[in-house]
């Protein structure tokens, strides 16, 4: 039953640390700029002079009002968030998350599953707004103010502001 031979054989492989890590000849011959794709960089766009928070469409607001009436809730006020309960998220905000965070305040009194479908429908209805919300999300992620997106957005973009110059990052960090 017992044998002196092993039941299996281990095959020795070359360690990854011994692999050739030198730069290939092709890369040495060409400039580095030719190998770098522009999509690798996160470019923060300058503040735009004329950018404003998009107003929700009347169709969207009418649908929300219909669902409020159907559910028996006539609460038309925006949700008030408790500032102590908002925690700064480590996750990066994308354009749809920014859109959803801002527009969901118009749907207070509507069930969450209904509101989610209305927001998704509104998002797909107007593709021109995607760039604006992407801009807001990039700015928020870059600045990382330490408080909620909706509060940051209303503080910074409720009115047209700025002269279109590049943002001074240190000013935002000091705030």
UniProtKB/Swiss-Prot annotation:
Does the keyword Lyase feature in the UniProt annotation? no
Which keywords has UniProt assigned to this entry? Answer: Activator, DNA-binding, Nucleus, Transcription, Transcription regulation
Q: What triggers production of this protein? A: Repressed in a/alpha diploid cells by A1/ALPHA2.
Source organism superkingdom: Eukaryota
GO terms under cellular component:
nucleus; RNA polymerase II transcription regulator complex
Residue range(s) of DNA binding per entry: 88-144
One Gene Ontology molecular-function label: DNA binding, bending
Question: What InterPro entries does the entry give?
Answer: MATalpha_HMGbox (IPR006856)
Write out the GO biological process terms: positive regulation of mating-type specific transcription, DNA-templated; regulation of mating-type specific transcription, DNA-templated; regulation of transcription by RNA polymerase II
Pfam short name (any one): MATalpha_HMGbox
The subcellular localization recorded is:
Nucleus
Concerning PROSITE patterns, the annotation shows: ALPHA_BOX
UniProt key word Lipid metabolism: no
Q: What's this protein's function?
A: Mating type proteins are sequence specific DNA-binding proteins that act as master switches in yeast differentiation by controlling gene expression in a cell type-specific fashion. Transcriptional coactivator that, in alpha-cells, binds cooperatively with MCM1 and STE12 to a DNA sequence termed the QP' element, to activate the transcription of alpha-specific genes.
Q: What further note is attached to this protein's record? A: There are three genetic loci for mating type genes in S.cerevisiae. MAT is the expression locus that determines the mating type of the cell, whereas HML (containing HMLALPHA1 and HMLALPHA2) and HMR (containing HMRA1 and HMRA2) represent silenced repositories of mating type information. The mating type is determined by the MAT locus, which contains either a copy of HML or of HMR. Diploid cells are usually heterozygous for the MAT locus.
The similarity comment for this entry is: Belongs to the MATALPHA1 family.
Q: How does it assemble?
A: Binds DNA with a high specificity in complex with an MCM1 dimer. Interacts with STE12.
What is the name listed in the Swiss-Prot or TrEMBL entry for this protein? Mating-type protein ALPHA1
According to its UniProt entry, this protein's organism is Saccharomyces cerevisiae (strain ATCC 204508 / S288c)
Instruction: Provide the organism lineage as a comma list.
Output: Eukaryota, Fungi, Dikarya, Ascomycota, Saccharomycotina
Gene name tied to this protein: MATALPHA1
